[in-house]
């Protein structure tokens, strides 16, 4: 069982009472699979690398780079935000969102959700329940808004709204122009949950989001009204971990079908209009997944990389040689599936059969957030803050 969020400091969103058992026995402690031997069919190379502050260290974070108009935007947990030239990684501008604490020291901003770029703004959320909109031109703060709780997932911009899913189960819509809160929807919270929240996805005027209560919700964006809720995961089992029912992955909407994935299961297809379940498959994950054509690509809670059909979730192939290597979410790049791991490797996988086609050691601090593929570039940020541009 994948416990990446539980193994890092402070990752349960409630304090466990003494005497609670997280594990059944010592047998539940898993070992990382050894690095598989791969004969590279091509040689991935690092085009450039640039340091962006001190990164995230051993804290859970959803910070990853964003690319727009040939500029890469990246941040670290302390509050440093940089704009970099996408061709060579050279700095365009740099700002700090850390707050002054006395004459010489600064209080870290604890950035945690982002980066999102849209409409001339860079959006980032923080553990201090702040959402920032920076001007893409120079990094100045266009607006800053206090939200209902920690902003652990990336902001999502749609229809003039900035959608924020906070750690206490609130979905909030902010005005894109000035950050004013337009509406708030309570998604309910269980007594125990993983640290991290589902980023919403938008389609046909609705925001679709997963919740820590095991439900997927559709909300009318114009007024903030609940359209439907559907449970896809039940809190069952003999241990606290077995009973975690979080839906922390971002739903995907394709042709009127919502695909959603919960930590302890299930992978579920729902009708966008009604929320009715069309099919479900017993799979679980905290990693975002991909729907491409007639296939679903995902990394499950044990770090199996899988391809499934969108019609019924039938398994097409499974790659099991990366078990418990704490993989990132997958990304499609140049016809291959790419995942990073906690030891700083990138693994390139053939989408047709799941075989490895290349492997690259990139960074010694390791990866936690997924690579980003955009405009023909592959970007990834390591835990120490270094941003890499990879080519093949």
Swiss-Prot record:
PROSITE patterns xrefs: PROKAR_LIPOPROTEIN
HAMAP family: OM_assembly_BamB
Function: Part of the outer membrane protein assembly complex (Bam), which is involved in assembly and insertion of beta-barrel proteins into the outer membrane. Nonessential member of the complex, which may orient the flexible periplasmic domain of BamA for interaction with other Bam components, chaperones and nascent outer membrane proteins. Efficient substrate folding and insertion into the outer membrane requires all 5 subunits.
Self-association and partners: Part of the Bam complex, which is composed of the outer membrane protein BamA, and four lipoproteins BamB, BamC, BamD and BamE. Monomer. Interacts directly with BamA. The Bam complex has the shape of a hat, with the BamA beta-barrel crown in the outer membrane and the periplasmic brim formed by the BamA POTRA domains and the 4 lipoproteins.
Lipid-substituted positions (S-diacylglycerol cysteine): 20
Keywords associated with the record: Cell outer membrane, Lipoprotein, Membrane, Palmitate, Signal
GO biological process: Gram-negative-bacterium-type cell outer membrane assembly; protein insertion into membrane
Gene Ontology molecular function terms on file: identical protein binding
Compartments where found: Cell outer membrane
Membrane topology type: Lipid-anchor
Signal peptide: 1-19
Identification of the protein by name: Outer membrane protein assembly factor BamB
Gene: bamB
Similarity comment: Belongs to the BamB family.
An example Gene Ontology CC term for this record: membrane
Lipid group attachment sites (N-palmitoyl cysteine): 20
Source organism (scientific name): Escherichia coli (strain K12)
